[in-house]
């Protein structure tokens, strides 16, 4: 079997996301994001941002959001706000979650 590339892990993570298997999303994200050949299409980070948020790795989710935002602020800002609005609706309240949502709201001028 050939060595797996970013696309392989992205597809696996996206499928796991559809089943809300957040641990698998994070596992595939770790593999995908550690590769030196991964393309940086900001929207392709969203599945991993969502996965990290759902397992409580809020700082990692925020960091990936920032790196996506830096590529194209005009487009990514609105998209990230929609993603984080959904994350806020789907995740349980916690101090870390609140801090992450506040940080995202301030950085991207979101209405969360």
Tell me what each language-model feature is.
Residues 1-112:
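C-terminal luminal/periplasmic domains and tails of membrane-associated envelope-modifying transferases
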